């Protein structure tokens, strides 16, 4: 998942609005939907594409073009029935990834059974953090060092094999700093920039979280 994917956020309460705003602020294409016109009005200034619709209705899902969306985030934890219906309709529409906010572990089991690809607890993962994770997913491991800086593991690409870090100029091209190399269970913090990279190893890098998009 990345900035090149299309997103829909269904439910514009505080959590859903935070997810949508963070995605929009980072250049992602986002469709935001809520059944309450007041919530839509409150979000329209920061989220350009906002629609008022009942996403538990099949016709609304079709009209909104949800079948063309890559990732749907359903943010209606207080309404289990609506969340279940929304998950079902989104999966029936062919959405590859459906993420849904839930209120407790029982709801988590139910939502997983009806097809949710990922179920999140808002008290454990903020809306802003979810958006950042969506934008930077695809890495083997990601650790937020601060609000702006993250450390991630990235697989050595096929086109990098046999080349050195000097030749690749990763810092210049992608604004990342290679701090270690993982080879299986072994991690070496002594990074030789003149050593040719091997297939199957991972680079551990530190960079501005948003600039990590360049590596995707």
Model feature map: region roles:
Residues 1-216:
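Cytosolic regulatory regions of ion transport systems
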């Amino acid at each position: 998942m990345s900035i090149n994917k299309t997103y829909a956020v269904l439910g514009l309460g505080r959590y859903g609005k935070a997810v949508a705003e963070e995605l929009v602020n980072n250049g992602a294409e986002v469709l935001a939907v809520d059944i309450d016109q007041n919530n839509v009005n409150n979000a329209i200034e920061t989220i350009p594409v906002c629609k008022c619709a009942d996403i538990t209705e099949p016709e609304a899902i079709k009209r909104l073009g949800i079948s063309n969306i890559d990732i749907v985030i359903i943010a209606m934890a207080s309404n289990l029935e609506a969340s279940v219906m929304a998950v079902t309709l989104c999966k029936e529409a062919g959405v590859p990834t459906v993420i849904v906010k839930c209120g407790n572990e029982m709801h988590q089991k139910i939502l997983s059974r009806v097809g949710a690809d990922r179920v999140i607890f808002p008290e454990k993962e903020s809306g802003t953090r979810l958006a950042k994770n969506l934008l930077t997913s695809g890495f083997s491991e990601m650790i937020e060092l601060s609000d702006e800086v993250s450390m991630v593991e990235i697989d050595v690409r096929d086109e990098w094999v046999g080349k050195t870090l000097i030749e690749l100029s990763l810092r210049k091209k992608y604004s990342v700093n290679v701090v270690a190399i993982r080879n299986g269970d072994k991690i070496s913090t002594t990074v030789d920039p003149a050593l040719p990279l091997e297939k199957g190893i991972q680079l551990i890098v530190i960079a501005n979280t948003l600039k990590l998009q360049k590596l995707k």
